Regions:
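Basic polyanion-binding and macromolecular-assembly surfaces
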Residues: 1-40, 46-352
Length: 352
């Protein structure tokens, strides 16, 4: 049995002038890589966008990360026994589980699946006082996003879930320099003899071709969700990673784009981030940045496979420019093939 199975996602995506992820001063986030400044989008920002995409799919079991965990349990209690004092029972259920809560909510954000909230509610309605049962109810039945992104509970590490997915900070394949947009706002009801602006301001932005990378530990995921749901979850993760985008300043820039090229691999050794393809920044040229970035990614991947890393067990590409790595498919065909490949691999490993 091969206990290692990873799905790596590599995406090249061009975004126009935008500020989709900004720092505490309002500037687009950046990073120095290869000695030059790059545009950067944090992994947290893209994971939040992915979780929002999950929530839009009614077929997916998505959890809630909130300080109002008592409200989740309360809703389940009301569904089971509306005549009971749901507020009191929900707070007591969390207390029995070791999760501190008051009228303002839990002390920290708590990640809970619908199944876990329902299990706590059932124990509360039954009148159980066994604290171990309440704690155990939070240790099983994670939602798919909890299994992917993990859960950390500082007060009770036994409730932690290891994340099966890792998402890298996206960086531009080339050097960038932030720019400023000077804007004004005019008062629509202002007198005609006072034509000046009522508000002046600036917004900082940049544009870039981003290299985006994420990996999913399939065996870890299957251990938490089971083989069938793990395969479905890998597909959902891939779809969300391909098509989601953080929403920062989206009304100002309308910057929602789709990937230029996608490369997905099924690996049986370890995850391999191919960001090294862009350690030397792609130079400015008449071709733009997307085309030479594709060439650099393909060349670097082949170099890695001929020297350090084994070639992937299976590879898939979407879009043009990476056909040397695998035949190009549509996004839907690739996701279908990926789900089947993961399902078959888990079946071969006899993971239930």
């Amino acid at each position: 049995m091969n206990k290692r199975l990873y799905v790596d996602f590599h995406i090249l995506q061009t975004v126009p002038p935008s500020c989709i992820n900004r720092d505490d001063t309002g500037s687009p986030k950046t990073a120095v890589y290869g000695g030059v400044t790059r545009a950067r989008v944090s992994s947290q920002a893209w994971k939040h966008a992915m979780r929002a995409a999950f929530a839009e799919n009614a077929q997916l079991d998505v959890g809630k990360r909130t300080k109002k965990a008592a409200e989740l349990v309360k809703a389940q209690i009301l569904a089971l026994a509306p005549e009971l004092d749901a507020d009191k029972l929900a707070k007591k259920a969390l207390e029995n589980a070791g999760i501190k809560s008051d009228d303002k909510g839990t002390k920290a954000l708590f990640f809970m699946s619908t199944a876990q909230a329902k299990a706590l509610a059932e124990l509360a309605v039954e009148g159980s006082a066994d604290k171990k049962q309440y704690r155990d109810a939070l240790k099983v039945a994670p939602s798919m996003d909890m299994a992917l992104f993990g859960r950390m509970v500082a007060d009770d590490p036994s409730l932690n879930y290891d994340a099966a997915a890792q998402v890298a900070h996206s960086i531009s394949t080339h050097a960038v320099q932030n720019e400023y947009d000077y804007f004004t706002a005019v008062d629509d009801c202002q007198a005609e003899d006072n034509a000046g602006a009522s508000h002046l301001g600036t917004v900082e932005y940049n544009s870039s071709t981003l290299y985006r990378y994420a990996t999913v530990n399939v065996m870890e995921l299957a251990g938490q969700l089971g083989a069938a749901q793990a395969a479905e979850t890998v597909r959902a993760f891939g779809e969300a990673f391909l098509f989601s985008m953080p929403t920062g300043k989206q009304n100002t820039f309308a910057n929602r784009t789709l990937p230029d090229a996608v490369y997905v691999t099924l690996r049986e050794d370890q995850p391999v981030n191919l960001c090294g393809a862009f350690e030397r920044a792609v130079p400015r040229s008449a071709q733009g940045y997307a085309a030479p970035s594709k060439a650099a990614l393909a060349q670097y991947a082949q170099q890695m496979y001929s020297s350090f890393a084994e070639a992937p067990a299976q590879s898939f590409t979407v879009g043009s420019g990476l056909e040397v790595l695998a035949p190009a498919q549509t996004a839907k065909a690739m996701l279908d093939a990926l789900e089947k490949a993961v399902r078959d691999a888990l079946a071969g490993n006899e993971v239930g």
